[in-house]
């Protein structure tokens, strides 16, 4: 499997990133271990998480995902086989991007992950209350200390990203090398400005909501199918006329390609020139094998064009 380099100075990763928000939430520790085992056995290596995962779940408070991953790493001894990505700034217990908060949060994450370094450390959410120089300076000290290898920015708009890159250049600070925006066939907002910034500066891009919280798997055909599902709140907004029309095209392409809708949606993302790799999650081995199959799927140019047109119509 051909690896893809994250930006100019980041690590090389396989073309699909495991979204670790499910660990300790919709996948218990035993199930999570099986999923992670299968993931690396298939040759994939990048795992994305955050300190806040999954504080929104009933009875959860945050830190669960990192803890599960750390326990798996300790049990399996596979730290050198994976690229760990985690984030700081969104969790109520460690909110914001002040220097003090970043310094405390990274040590907490390292402890939960049971490792001495994080491969890609993201600012989870922009913090306009803190000067960019303070945030980037704090991140730079983590790089100097060996606690972090590469920096990333999640949920930053194009204007703030350009400002951050300028501050890094002007003040000789490490720059954001990777960005993590929402991006999928339905949500094309990344293409308006961020994609151009990423390509101009040679940034790596790993997208979240790559399957639109499961909408693009095709397993939900109506709002009624969502009742009682853990992701019901995330999914409801996709079931409009535009989303349903997109699903029809997605199912048609999948049938013609002898693939699943999830594989097609991910393969389309993998073909996008500005994207390094999409992030996707699974809670069962069957689901995981399905999404990993996207890496082997080569869609025809006509299929890609049909998906692109349908997605733009839904944007």
Task: Give a label for each model feature.
Residues 110-129:
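Active-site groove signature of glycoside hydrolases
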Residues 20-30, 88-100, 129:
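Active-site mouth loops of central-metabolism enzymes
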Residues 8, 41, 70-81, 110-114, ...:
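Acidic (Asp/Glu)-rich catalytic clusters
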Residues 1-80:
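N-terminal binding-site loop/beta-alpha segment at the start of enzyme catalytic domains
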Residues 28-39, 97-112, 161-166:
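Short, acidic/polar
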Residues 126-315:
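Beta/alpha (TIM)-barrel catalytic core signal, keyed to glycine-rich beta->alpha loops juxtaposed to Asp/Glu
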Residues 15, 46, 117-120, 150, ...:
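Residues at the N-termini of beta-strands
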């Amino acid at each position: 499997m051909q690896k893809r380099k994250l930006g100019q100075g980041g690590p090389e990763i396989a073309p699909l990133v495991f979204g670790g928000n499910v660990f300790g939430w919709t996948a218990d520790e035993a199930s999570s271990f099986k999923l992670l085992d299968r993931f690396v056995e298939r040759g994939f290596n990048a795992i994305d998480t955050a300190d806040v995962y999954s504080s929104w779940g009933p009875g959860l408070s945050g830190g669960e995902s990192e803890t599960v991953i750390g326990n798996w790493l300790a049990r399996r001894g596979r730290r050198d086989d994976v690229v760990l990505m985690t984030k700081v700034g969104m969790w109520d217990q460690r909110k914001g991007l002040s220097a003090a908060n970043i310094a405390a949060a990274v040590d907490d994450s390292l402890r939960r992950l049971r490792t001495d370094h994080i491969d890609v450390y993201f600012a989870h959410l922009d913090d306009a209350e803190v000067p960019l120089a303070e945030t980037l300076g704090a991140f730079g000290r983590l790089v100097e200390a060996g606690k972090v290898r590469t920096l990333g920015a999640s949920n930053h708009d194009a204007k703030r990203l350009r400002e951050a890159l300028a501050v890094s250049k002007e003040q000789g600070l490490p720059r954001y090398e990777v960005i993590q925006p929402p991006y999928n066939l339905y949500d094309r907002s990344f293409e308006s400005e961020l994609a151009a910034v990423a390509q101009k500066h040679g940034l790596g891009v790993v997208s979240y909501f790559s399957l639109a919280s499961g909408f693009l798997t095709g397993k939900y055909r109506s709002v009624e199918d969502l009742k009682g599902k853990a992701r019901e709140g995330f999914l409801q907004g996709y079931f409009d006329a535009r989303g349903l029309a997109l699903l029809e095209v997605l199912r048609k392409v999948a049938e013609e390609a002898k693939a699943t809708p999830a594989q097609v949606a991910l393969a389309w993302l993998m073909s996008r020139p500005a994207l390094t790799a999409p992030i996707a999650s699974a809670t069962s081995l069957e689901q995981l094998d399905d999404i990993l199959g996207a890496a082997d799927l080569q869609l025809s140019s006509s299929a890609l064009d049909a998906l692109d047109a349908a997605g733009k119509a839904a944007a």
